[in-house]
Amino acid sequence: MSTLVTTRIREHATRLGMTHLCETVSELVARAETDQMGYLDFVDLLLGEELGVREGRRFRNALKLSGLPHHKSLDDFDFTFQPDLEPRKVRDLATLEFIERHGNVTLLGPPGVGKTHLASALAVAACQAGFSVYFTSLDDMVRKLKLAEATGRFNRQLTSYLRPAVLVVDEVGYLPLDRAEANMVFQLVSRRYERGSMIITSNKSFAEWGQVLGDDVLATAILDRLLHHCDVLAINGPSYRLKDRLGLLPTTDPHPQDPTAGSDAAKTAKPDRPAA
């Protein structure tokens, strides 16, 4: 290809915002000549390369904006350490069909069993698929909502939690809330109901959410909306953080209490589809 034509292609690519093509046109032409590509194959190569770079850039930006503390994947999760957890069900969630139907995912279990890892892995997969994601702990979210309310910016702050396609709320139950704080959580869940997906992690069974939220009526109302279209994963295994300290590893109860039992909303909740 002549230098004049190469220069003109680079100028066109720059004006079209195709920065990768501008930088690699000579290399791509050489590859096409080596592989004896036809015209259509060469055009497909050019567009595929540019699209791949743009998608990679979009994915990195989405991860940066998500607030995820760790970029986990399901491939990193040790399912053999949690034998009661069905890998097939988790991988079914990773298809992200629950996001398409504005459903939720709740992960229940004691500290250290991998709830946040799984929530983060689903969130990373959602970012990669083009969904907007935001991660927060319940305590941090409530703190920001209270500060916003005190400064007359409550609706604006609440909207920031309504905007993402997927909102991950970590550590529900680690710190109790008062009734005013629980009401803020109710407003959030109510506004997102059937409009956007939530991924929740909690170390408390649903029966204990009344204590966590400081009000049984509010807890029931929140769970009613949260569980209407929800996949619940209960993890009852040992802690990953203690697995290398055998002397400290507690013995797992062979008959653990079902964390999904006990609340009226949990009893009446019906899954959208049978478990995988």
What are the residue ranges of the model-derived segments?
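Solvent-exposed alpha-helical segments within well-ordered globular domains of core cellular machineries
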Residues: 7, 11-14, 23-26, 44-45, ...
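Conserved, well-folded catalytic cores of nucleic-acid-processing
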Residues: 12-19, 28-31, 49, 53, ...
